[in-house]
Swiss-Prot record:
Function description: Part of TspanC8 subgroup, composed of 6 members that interact with the transmembrane metalloprotease ADAM10. This interaction is required for ADAM10 exit from the endoplasmic reticulum and for enzymatic maturation and trafficking to the cell surface as well as substrate specificity. Different TspanC8/ADAM10 complexes have distinct substrates.
Subunit structure and binding partners: Homodimer; disulfide-linked.
Entry keywords, A to Z: Cell junction, Cell membrane, Cytoplasm, Disulfide bond, Glycoprotein, Membrane, Transmembrane, Transmembrane helix
Positions in the Extracellular compartment: 45-62, 116-233
Disulphide bond pairs: 154-222, 155-187, 171-181, 188-201
Gene coding for it: tspan33
Family in the record: Belongs to the tetraspanin (TM4SF) family.
Topological type in the membrane: Multi-pass membrane protein
Protein known as: Tetraspanin-33
Length: 281
């Protein structure tokens, strides 16, 4: 009789749910939950500090992107955290489904970007042209463009003449700006030993032909150089893309394993409950 009771007690204490899987999934989601709060905070801060039209030149406000990504990540990781901790199948399935959808959307975006590379290039060119037009409107945008032009040794989207699309650098005769026919200093060729940057080095460069201007500034556009850089660093970009997808695949795998374990545990509990009520069944 005593052995039968101990056997029944052991069956009730036994669990299919692995603590390793359960708490690994919990801490995995906790890390990304904290990251989501950081993204939301940065996005909200940027929206409050910046003027409404500060980054209107871009297709989508980066602060808004951060907020949307942060809120979406917060919801998904919340489902993962609570679902794993409380062993809630509904929340875990929600977590798994959203992660799967995100993974498939990223895969689809990569395929579409490769198939429609010409349209993607045209979209990037339009964005760069818009950024040029608003170069003086926002300091952060200005610093971003200057950093890109210095980093890639380029000037403008297609060529340095693109800077004529900016009202201050426009080369038309009726432009009263002191920067007429100029380009930003980030287009200039700087010697490595040069410690003081001449911010007026791009003055009047649009009035020169390509050959004459190339002695003072980078005349090649940033779009072609960016495309060449992407082609030269495909393995690096592929590694980054893989690094972004691995956590998602790990999350999907762990959540699915935990769901199966919880379902097995529920079956065991139902069996034990039925066995207690009818030991002869």
């Amino acid at each position: 009789m005593g052995n039968a009771k101990r056997a029944t007690q052991n069956d009730e204490d036994y669990t299919f749910v692995s603590p390793v899987v359960k708490y690994l999934l919990f801490f995995f989601n906790m890390i990304f939950w904290i990251i989501s709060l950081v993204l939301i905070s940065i996005g909200v801060y940027s929206r409050i500090v910046k003027h409404e039209t500060a980054l209107a030149c871009l297709t989508v406000d980066p602060a808004l992107i951060l907020m949307v990504v942060g809120i979406l990540m917060f919801f998904i990781t919340f489902c993962g955290c609570v679902g794993s901790l409380r062993e809630n199948i509904c929340l875990l399935q929600t977590f798994c489904i959203f992660l799967t959808i995100m993974f498939l959307l990223q895969l689809l975006a990569g395929v579409l970007g490769f198939v429609f590379s010409d349209k993607a290039r045209g979209k990037v060119t339009d964005m760069f042209d818009n950024a040029i037009k608003h170069y003086r409107d926002d300091l952060d945008l200005q610093n971003l463009i200057d950093y890109g032009q210095k980093q890639f040794n380029c000037c403008g989207g297609i060529s340095f003449m693109d800077w004529s699309k900016n009202m201050y650098f426009n080369c038309s005769d009726d432009n009263p700006s002191r920067e007429r026919c100029s380009v930003p200093f980030s287009c200039c060729l700087h010697a490595k030993e040069e410690t003081i940057i001449n911010t007026m080095c791009g003055h009047g460069m649009q009035a020169l032909n390509y050959l004459a201007a190339s002695a003072f500034i980078n005349t090649n556009g940033c779009i072609d150089i960016l495309v060449n850089w992407i082609h030269s660093n495909l393995f690096l970009l592929g590694g980054i893309a893989l690094g972004l997808t691995i956590p998602q695949l790990v999350g999907i795998l762990l959540s699915q394993v935990l769901i199966n374990q919880i379902q097995d545990q529920i079956k065991l509990q139902n069996y034990n409950q039925q066995h207690r009520s009818d030991p002869w069944s």
